[in-house]
């Protein structure tokens, strides 16, 4: 849900930016062009902005559909991110750190990953 909200706000920000750009172009063209040519320029600007907005809309839809396919495929995403216990009772999200119920590699000091970190260094 948050991703969709971010996508919508970024789309609105781009839309506002395009509208400001369009109004600035219309203002500049209004000052320096004869009336008939100004009307033609304004029509072209409106057409270009509409075309840009259509492209942005297509890109946004493509990104959302790609994201939906990769995130909500179920087992493939779960298998990719959940490499801990096969019991997914405490599964919340593939992006959160999983809760480890038991770790047989604990040493007497309670440090479970000391040897792994030492091996990396």
Swiss-Prot record:
Biased composition (Polar residues): 100-111
Chain spans, region Disordered: 85-111
UniProt-recorded name of the protein: Putative uncharacterized protein DDB_G0286001
Organism: Dictyostelium discoideum
Source lineage: Eukaryota, Amoebozoa, Evosea, Eumycetozoa, Dictyostelia
């Amino acid at each position: 849900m948050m991703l969709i909200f971010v996508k919508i706000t970024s789309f609105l920000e781009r839309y506002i930016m395009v509208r400001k750009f369009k109004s600035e172009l219309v203002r500049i063209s209004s000052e320096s062009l004869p009336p008939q040519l100004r009307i033609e320029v304004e029509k072209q600007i409106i057409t270009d902005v509409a075309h840009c907005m259509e492209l942005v809309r297509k890109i946004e839809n493509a990104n959302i559909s790609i994201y939906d396919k990769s995130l909500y495929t179920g087992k493939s995403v779960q298998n990719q991110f959940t490499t801990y216990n096969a019991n997914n009772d405490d599964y919340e999200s593939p992006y959160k750190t999983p809760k480890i119920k038991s770790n047989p590699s604990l040493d007497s000091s309670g440090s479970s990953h000391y040897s792994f970190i030492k091996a990396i260094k």
